[in-house]
Amino acid sequence: PLLSVLGEYQESDKHFRSYMGFRSAEYVNMFGMYDRRSDHYACATDDGSFGAKGNAVQLFFGDFENAKPDVILACGPTPMLRALKAGLQERGVRVPCYVSLEERMGCGIGACLVCVCKKSGGQNARVCKDGPVFAIDEVELEWQI
């Protein structure tokens, strides 16, 4: 979903910094697509076989002072989004942040409730119908059915 955002704004005066993480070099994909559309691109692998050793969240926070983002867009597995949310809270970052949740979706219309996530305040949301993009403070990333 983030590649489409980059494509949509490519002709604008907006600047994008992309940080991607993979398990190892064999899993790296779409490198050129993000590299060409971003003002800054950084990649990490868990084992250091491509780019920096580490993960995308570490890359992001390592470059945060240079980036000075107006908005943060993130997509990835729940543990990564959880680490991003914790890092933002620990640093007192008040920049709007939106996450695209990766959940199994059974029916795609919200009827089966397979993709339910818990929102802040105790309500539930259906990722397929109410999302999949939410403000990071709007969802509880620790909770799973």
Sequence positions of predicted segments:
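Alpha-helix termini
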Residues: 34, 89, 121-123, 144
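Short acidic, glycine/serine/threonine-rich loops at helix termini
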Residues: 85, 110-111, 139
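Local cysteine-cluster metal-coordination motifs and their immediate loop/turn environment
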Residues: 1-4, 78-80, 102-133
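Short Fe-S-cluster ligation motifs
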Residues: 30, 118, 129-145
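FNR/FR-type flavoprotein reductase catalytic core
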Residues: 1-102
